[in-house]
Amino acid sequence: TDGIQYCFDYAESVGKPCVVNISLGSHLGPHDGTSASDQAFAAMAGPGRIIVGAAGNEGGTALHVGKDLEEGDTSLKTMIGFSESSASKLAYVDIWGSKGAPLKVKAVVVDALKGKVMYESPAVETDGETDVKYTFPDGSGVVSTVQMALQKNPTNERTEVMLMCRAKSIAENRKIGIVATSDAGTSIHMWNNAAEGYFLNGGKRGWTEGDTDYTVGELGGVSDNVISVGSYNTKMEYTTLGGVVYGINTALVGNKGALSLFSS
């Protein structure tokens, strides 16, 4: 924010308007305009001061998962997926409950064949423990440490849990999962901020699949006064300075005249 304010101040000193473009993608935050950065952007923008944010390039990654809770079904259960090409299996998951609602979160080891919880960590919860560091036991099929921290955001009155997972190895028939519980009539949302992370249900009943909803980045336009910019396919080939013509892979970007598949 200091850099943006510097640009605005200089523009004002020379009597000119100013537009600042930012591309600092992150999915840590509530994605509702109430984060500290979003509030700061909203306050700085105004006549002659425009902020433009990149929506992000995660439109093809299921880094979000959410659920509306009902009577008799007050938990969101999901599994963490890791890219096979990823050298280190890391997950940075930001979990948010509804305004004024309690929240309880625990990490689990799941039998990938049956969808059954085999091992679980102690929980962090609104009226209980707020910090947990847990190592899954020997024989669980998972060599991993999980850390969780819970806090209530004073601005939006929503409870947040930040979960960090670092796995050295995961057996083929095991998955690391998250179980989040709150009140009926409320919602839970999660975002995986790791570059190679996503959510899945493993094809098992009772578990929730990840999706690409709510994937416009925290710094890309969820603030009230920020203009969001995504990617749109205007051409399907380009010519290099050497005269070589290259085509665009439609499997990666989509068809001409459409929103790019990767655009959040």
What feature does the model see in each segment?
Residues 1-264:
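Loop-rich non-cytosolic ectodomains and luminal regions
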